A protein has these predicted regions:
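Intrinsically disordered, low-complexity terminal tails
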Residues: 1-72
Length: 72
């Protein structure tokens, strides 16, 4: 796995921890998310999907390139 793919997966893990922290904080206070928190959480989940998609594509491209090199 390339360094770029590793960085993307690390970034995704960091965003997930932030999102989880937001949910955990609201749960600890026995309340729903505020409108601002809800917007932040929605942005984080969108970022999670985008980062994961980018990482998956990068990894697939690396595997394709590796297979092409091996077939030569």
């Amino acid at each position: 796995m390339s360094e770029m793919a590793k960085r993307l997966l690390e970034q995704r893990a960091n965003v997930w921890e932030q999102a989880k922290g937001l949910l955990d904080a609201a749960a600890a206070e026995n309340r729903d998310l505020t409108a601002e928190e809800e917007a932040s959480y929605a942005k984080m989940t969108s970022d999670l999907e985008s980062i994961r998609s980018h990482a998956d594509k990068l990894i697939a491209d690396e595997e394709t390139a590796r297979a092409a090199e091996e077939s030569l």
